[in-house]
Design a protein with these regions (language model features):
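Conserved phosphate-binding elements of NTP-dependent enzyme cores
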Residues: 1-951
Length: 951
């Protein structure tokens, strides 16, 4: 018994009695130092087991090691509902959700590769002058002495020490100090002058001042005198001296610091922070290291010039209100001979400029609200107010408000490089640090391969170890399929899958051992071509001496794992059990929903015929945003279109950043600007665009499927019509848990109360008054067919379909939720507990329930994220229903089950990043498979061949 226990705790992670969310008191054993895949349908309990049980307990144990004082600042960790977990190593979770939105965070800073770049340039970079382009030089005093003796031998010269360079001031005190030290001459703004008592300059002009340390005819005989004078000049000039040729009046600079010998420009000794755009010493002074500056978008501030300011022509101000800013604008208009009711297009340009940008003139404010008093006030303008809200530490809502009137433009000073001129003037093998950061990872890796040959011996000695670290980290990024990214790519622009794989590469590079890693679908956004490299990376993490748990649905990942835990049998209340645990080989021999898809007994069938569409097209011509190569693309309407291609090939740029914003601006006056394109045709053939993504349907537990689909309003209206409600005079608000009246006021309609436990985790307990039902006693007394409003919210969709079968207005909205495979979730289930796949299907169901014209364009970006084979089958059924109504669906997808089910494919590539951005193929899946063009074709051909063999 003791031996078994030791084996269990030493070789396995043992979870006993897990009851988090829908887990049904399950026991699971996961082998340590192995690659384990947890799979199952969406909502079956995979994430509840991996993240909400195993990771949550690991994190809680870590925090428990801190003192009570430290835990007070860290926040409380809730104890997961589990009896016991043994064999748990320190846990690191690598999820998709934690994308960094900080504009200063880049791929380079996240992976720490940019830190090594900074070190490399600070220690081995060659400095060049940003004024003349000359290589910067620095000398010792002995070298300067030798150079002067060689270059000026026999010439009459002045030895100068610079004191002031291009600064305003009268410098009366400085001249007096120089005079008292015994110096007789100075050079002011290029002119030699004798110092006199009371000497001063024009204080409002820029001046350069050098003191004449010595004047002499240079000769070897006077070497000692020159050496002494040079020493004094170096001290006075802080390491910099000038030699003035008395005959030609030419000046040459010499410095102990890095210096341009032509212009005298000098740099301080470089340090790593001089190359950081997050440091004042390295950042571009104009954009503060962001690479972009805020500019006002006048088309968004004044979208309709035919309106007057009074009528709300300046959208940022809205319609006229009795407030100071409108009184000031009235005064400005009066000054220019117009009124606040004049159409904006008829207001003089000078007047509009002052309204937007302010005026130095103090305006006389007259208004009835001020009585007979007159006020004279300065006016700063609408523009300054908007920019102030955006750039100051205003509230998030104020910044969001200002953001809609602002467009980001590339910084004109640094051209988007983020760094100051000095930092950009250091080079290694002809490249500055920003140019390296702009290279794709694959391109950068190739460039670094031959770099040693281009370095001098000193540089090579310094750079060898740094280059080794950089190459190592780049190799890990290449292994996880991120060859198309660049170091300067902003973290905020990365997809969840990309940011997750970056963190995975960083963890592999950290070489930690005895750690438990938990990953959430790392294959998201990854083309089949790159899947093998990802799997090898996970195995490398395992072989280093770590345990790896992956929540995944990818077939190749499951078959490559050491161990598989299959959750099910279905989802929600019908899930939460372990239906299989063992090796992939063992799994293929058992009868579960997952194994039936893996062994080929069940499959998603290829459509018998492809839709041809309605003969109409939307065509984009000349799309050139990001890496798109000025492409022309036509989308056949009335079909299911799938956009494919390797990661970074331009799929999202074409659909999410070009097509969707064009249509959103056309139909909804959206504020998001599309990326560059020449023209769009056929826009009249659709009447709206809908993006069905996997984002939550609500941000608070008060949001649920009933409220999102709108069926809750119908249910509340039904309750209002009941005789009991009419007698009591109840209105629809009575049956809402969000407003006072019908809700339980003890818990404010939450159904539970939060008990603060100080240094222990907060505890959620059911409300003692409503017992979790959210409503007060009087509201719950009103019943329909024996059920209160709380009972109905507690029903699953399947139960609700039966219950409301005779009420068409309610049934139509609930039935579609059942049709998309969500029969197991509750009507009142908090939106925060729904998975991404479940949220997406709630949105799809809502669209299916709408009465539509058959002219809608739907966009879905990787809808199979988080979906099991069975979920994908149901999803495709829902998508096909929408297309059968005449609508058009564009799906960005790598999943071959979706690709083979499409009517029309647009394959992008051939590679990612700069080597992508072309349309390789358009046509049916069969035609692409036959063509052999690009990386998608061979995988699709294999999939279609398997399907054809089974027919």
């Amino acid at each position: 018994m003791i031996k078994d226990k030791q084996a269990l705790e030493g070789g396995r992670i043992s979870i006993l009695g897990a009851r988090v969310h829908n887990l049904k008191n399950i026991d699971v054993e996961i082998p340590r130092n192995k690659l384990t895949v947890i799979t199952g349908m969406s909502g079956s309990g995979k994430s509840s087991l991996a993240f909400d049980t195993i990771f949550a307990e690991g994190q809680r144990r870590y925090v428990e090691t801190f003192s009570a004082y430290a835990r007070n600042f860290l926040g409380n960790m809730e104890r997961p509902d589990v009896d016991k977990i043994t064999g748990l190593s320190p846990v690191i979770s690598i999820e998709q959700k934690t994308t960094n939105k900080n504009p200063r965070s880049t791929v380079g800073t996240t992976t720490e590769i940019y830190d090594f770049f900074r070190l490399l340039y600070a220690r081995a970079g060659e400095a060049y002058s940003y004024l003349s382009g000359e290589k910067m030089v620095k000398y010792t005093e002995d070298q300067v002495l030798r150079l002067i003796l060689d270059e000026y031998n026999g010439k009459k010269t002045y030895l100068l020490a610079p004191l002031v360079r291009n600064r305003k001031g009268h410098y009366k005190e400085l001249f007096e100090q120089i005079r008292k030290k015994g110096y007789l001459n100075v050079r002011v703004d290029g002119e030699l002058k004798e110092i006199f008592h009371g000497m001063k300059l024009d204080r409002y002009k820029m001046h350069s001042i050098e003191v004449v340390i010595d004047k002499m005819i240079v000769s070897e005989a006077d070497e000692r005198r020159l050496k002494e004078s040079l020493k004094i000049a170096m001290k006075q000039g802080d390491g910099l001296v000038l030699i003035l040729d008395a005959e030609t009046n030419e000046v040459r600079h010499y410095s102990r610091r890095l210096m341009d010998p032509v212009t005298g420009l000098s740099y301080s000794e470089p340090a790593p922070h001089n190359f950081s755009f997050n440091s004042p010493q390295g950042a571009c002074p104009k954009c503060k290291g962001l690479g972009q500056v805020n500019l006002l978008d006048m088309d968004k501030i004044v979208p309709d010039p035919s309106l007057s300011i009074y009528s709300g022509g300046i959208v940022a101000l809205g319609k006229y209100k009795n407030s100071l800013i409108f009184w000031q604008i009235e005064a400005l208009c009066q000054k220019h001979g117009v009124t606040i009711k004049t159409p904006i297009r008829d207001i003089p340009e000078e007047a509009m400029d002052e309204i937007m940008n302010g005026t130095d003139e103090r305006l006389q404010i007259k208004n009835d609200s001020l009585g007979s008093s007159n006020y004279f006030l300065s006016y700063e303008g609408v523009a300054k107010y908007i920019l102030m809200q955006q750039e100051s530490e205003a509230s998030a809502s104020a910044q969001k408000w200002a953001g809609q009137f602002i467009k980001m433009a590339t910084c004109p000073e640094c051209n988007g490089w983020r760094l100051n001129k000095e930092a950009l003037s250091y080079r290694i093998a002809g490249k500055n640090i920003a140019e390296l950061s702009a290279m794709d990872i694959s391109e950068l890796y190739e460039w670094l391969e031959g770099i040693e040959e281009k370095l001098d011996p000193k540089q090579l000695r310094i750079a060898t170890e740094i280059l080794k670290e950089i190459r190592s980290r780049l190799r890990f990024l290449l292994d996880v399929g991120l060859d198309y990214l660049s170091m300067n790519r902003g973290s905020a622009t990365l997809s969840g899958g990309e940011s997750q794989r970056i963190r995975l590469a960083t963890q592999i590079g950290s070489q930690l051992v005895n750690v438990l890693y938990i990953l959430d679908e790392p294959s998201i956004g990854l083309h089949q071509r790159d899947n093998v490299r990802l799997i090898n990376s996970l195995k490398q993490l395992r072989d280093t001496g770590n345990s790896v748990i992956v929540v995944e649905h990818d077939k190749d990942m499951m078959l490559s794992a050491d161990y598989v835990v299959d959750m099910g049998p279905k989802a929600g209340r019908l899930g939460g059990e372990v239906v299989f645990e063992g090796t992939p080989k063992e799994m293929l021999r058992v009868d579960t929903l997952t194994s039936s898809y893996l062994n080929g007994n069940t499959e998603i069938a290829v459509p018998a015929e492809r839709r041809k569409g309605n003969g109409q097209f939307i065509t984009i011509k000349g799309a050139s945003g990001n890496n798109l190569k000025h492409v022309d693309v036509s989308f056949p309407l009335g079909t299911l279109i799938c956009v494919t291609g390797v990661s970074g090939s331009g799929k999202s740029t074409l659909i999410n950043r070009t097509l969707q914003p064009i249509l959103s601006q056309h139909f909804y006056h959206s504020l998001e600007d599309p990326l560059a394109y020449d023209v769009i045709e056929g826009i009249e053939h659709v009447d709206k665009i809908v993006n069905v993504d996997q984002s939550p349907i609500g941000r608070s537990p008060r949001s649920n499927p009933a409220t999102y689909t709108g069926v809750f309003s119908d249910i509340r209206n039904l309750f209002v019509e009941l005789p009991e409600s009419k007698v009591r005079g109840y209105k629809p608000g009575r049956f809402s848990f969000n407003v006072s009246g019908g809700r339980c006021e003890t818990c404010k309609g939450n159904g539970y109360k939060t008990i603060e436990m100080n240094f222990l985790p907060d505890v959620l307990v059911p409300c003692e008054d409503c017992h979790g039902k959210r409503y007060n006693r009087e509201t719950l007394e009103v019943r329909f067919r024996g059920k209160s409003i709380a009972d109905i919210l507690d029903m699953t969709i399947n139960m609700a379909v039966e219950f409301f079968e005779n009420i068409p207005t309610i049934l139509s909205k609930i039935k579609v939720l059942q049709d998309v495979g969500l029969g197991y979730i509750k009507l009142g289930q908090p939106s925060t507990t729904l998975s991404g796949g479940e949220s997406q299907r709630v949105k799809l169901a809502t669209e299916l329930a709408k009465r539509d014209t058959g002219k809608t364009l739907y966009v879905l970006d990787e809808p199979t994220t988080g979906l099991h084979f069975e979920d994908i089958r149901v999803l495709l059924g829902a998508l096909n229903k929408l297309v059968d109504k005449g609508n058009t669906i564009i799906v960005i997808e790598h999943n071959l089950d979706v690709v083979k089910s499409a009517d029309y494919l647009i394959d992008m590539g051939p590679e990612g990043g700069r080597r992508g951005g072309n349309v390789l193929f358009t046509g049916t899946p069969e035609a692409l498979a036959k063509s052999g063009v690009g990386f998608t074709a061979p995988f699709l051909k294999e999939e279609l061949d398997i399907a054809n063999k089974k027919k």
